[in-house]
Amino acid sequence: MILGLGHVDLVCGDLERSLAFYAAVFGPLGLQDPALFEGERGEQIHYLRFPAPGSGSLGLRQALERQEFELYAPGFHHLALTVDRRDDVDVAHVAAVAAGAEVLHPPRAWPEYHPQYYATFFLDPDGFRIEVSAARDARLV
């Protein structure tokens, strides 16, 4: 039986910039300091831990070379994080703007997803699409 998603790793164009961005945006919501591991290339992988028990972690590691992210190329599309309350979505949005993120959609209700769905969408420093949502009892997919 699958219990959940343990972790997701993002390969970053500038690891230090990405670490600073994720700490600034999600630190106020409880994202914990990274646990460090060595990757298969000998690089450091920084696993940012989510505060809820069993909620997994987000790994950040340095790219071999800088490439532009393409949303609809094979691979990663977006990262969706769930928070407790609408206020937390707003906190993430304000922090993302302060950290220089390009905002795709400011916080609003998305009734086409679920009657209680409330979310914001923005890009991280590498252009990865990040969604932060709050939806009590909403299970999408």
Ranges and model annotations:
Residues 57, 131-132:
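Short glycine-/small-residue motifs
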Residues 2-4, 72-76, 114:
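Short glycine-enriched loop/turn motifs at secondary-structure junctions
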Residues 9-56:
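Core segments of cupin and vicinal oxygen chelate
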Residues 128:
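Conserved Rossmann-like nucleotide-cofactor binding loop
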